[in-house]
């Protein structure tokens, strides 16, 4: 079985080289075109080989299965291969994306949901196939957790939640939330809450008891900030490193410093990208931000904790044509 994986994983030092050597995965460039990936998948499938693809292309931030490109249905129909839908549950709480390498002890489950023959796929439209895939794979981790709570034990359960949450719901300030052990506190107004082993949140006057609802509120606030920004920066993040990315040949340092997002431009160290020219934006892992502007690809990293996911919401709002991937 050949797995479709991010091209950037294959550049991740010795581990990336081992993955490439042992698995021969099909590379997919973050925030870039998927045309070459699709062609490789079709070639393997028509040779009778198995290909595994996660249609969302990303791990969820809020526990809800993300949307995927509508081309998945067309690919499944034209491949001439059978389609097996396989659903994983429990992974969101066992290894939260915002937590980095923190693993929690709990229950995960995986099982095949449906097998569609080539004949069944040919009898459906690409849209109907997509609807079946959504029906088979959709998951809301918090909805499941409310019905059947499972504990996911570990250390420092809340640490690095700042990678997801950057707005205090009490005072409204940005970048004032700080995590330690299982607690997050706003250093400006004193608001605080705890992250429980079940993934739920508890605290005095806390408006949300889960990260799904908090994230939905925060996305709405990001849209508001974009609309009200006028000529002022919407976000500013300090101490970042920007590299340009060349397909298959690594990265090259562009500059270090601060990044700022305006309604019309993304300012990076030694580069300014008009928002209208941004064609793709995505995240690798918890906070490596990938930006595509035509044939030029950038990766923005930092050794300190940042909430980079906010740029995905903002840029997809400011430029409706941008290809958006979490």
Name each model-derived stretch.
Residues 1-131, 147-148, 171, 182, ...:
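Soluble catalytic domains of membrane acyltransferases
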Residues 72, 125-141, 308-319:
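Short amphipathic C-terminal alpha-helix that caps PH/PH-like domains
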Residues 86-88, 176-178, 193-195, 257-263, ...:
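Broad, structure-driven detector of short, well-ordered beta-strand segments within folded domains
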Residues 116, 127-164:
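A conserved mid-domain beta-alpha-beta active-site/ligand-binding segment of alpha/beta enzyme cores
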Residues 153-206:
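Cys/His-rich short segments
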Residues 201-258:
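Anionic N-terminal interaction surfaces
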Residues 259-289:
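Phosphoinositide-dependent membrane-docking surfaces
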Residues 277-326:
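Acidic, Ser/Thr- and proline-rich intrinsically disordered linker/docking segments
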């Amino acid at each position: 079985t050949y797995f479709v994986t991010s091209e950037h994983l294959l550049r991740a030092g010795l581990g990336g080289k081992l993955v490439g050597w042992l698995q021969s995965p099909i590379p997919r460039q973050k925030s870039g075109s998927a045309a070459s990936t699709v062609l490789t998948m079709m070639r393997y499938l028509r040779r009778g080989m198995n290909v595994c693809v996660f249609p969302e292309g990303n791990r969820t931030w809020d526990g809800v299965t993300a949307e995927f490109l509508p081309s998945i249905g067309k690919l499944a129909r034209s491949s001439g291969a059978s389609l097996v839908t396989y659903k994983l549950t429990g992974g969101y709480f066992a290894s939260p994306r915002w937590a980095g390498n923190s693993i929690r002890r709990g229950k995960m489950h995986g099982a095949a949901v449906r097998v569609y023959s080539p004949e069944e796929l040919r009898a459906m439209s690409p849209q109907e196939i997509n609807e079946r895939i959504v029906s088979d794979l959709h998951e809301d981790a918090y909805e499941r957790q409310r019905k059947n709570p499972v504990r996911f034990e570990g250390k420092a359960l809340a640490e690095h939640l700042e990678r997801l949450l950057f707005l205090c719901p009490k005072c409204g300030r940005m970048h004032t939330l700080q995590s330690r052990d299982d607690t997050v506190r706003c250093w400006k107004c004193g608001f605080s809450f705890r992250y429980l082993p079940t993934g739920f949140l508890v605290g005095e006057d806390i408006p949300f008891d889960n990260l799904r609802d908090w994230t939905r509120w925060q996305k709405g606030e990001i849209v508001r900030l974009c609309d009200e920004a006028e000529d002022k920066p919407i976000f500013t993040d300090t101490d970042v490193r920007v590299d340009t990315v060349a397909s298959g040949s690594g990265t090259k340092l562009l500059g270090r410093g601060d990044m700022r997002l305006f309604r019309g431009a993304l300012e990076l160290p030694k580069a300014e990208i008009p928002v209208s020219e941004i064609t793709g934006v995505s995240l690798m892992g918890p906070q490596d931000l990938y930006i595509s502007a035509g044939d030029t690809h950038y990766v923005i990293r930092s050794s300190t904790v940042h909430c980079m996911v906010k740029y995905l919401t903002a840029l997809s709002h400011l430029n409706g044509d941008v290809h958006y991937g979490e």
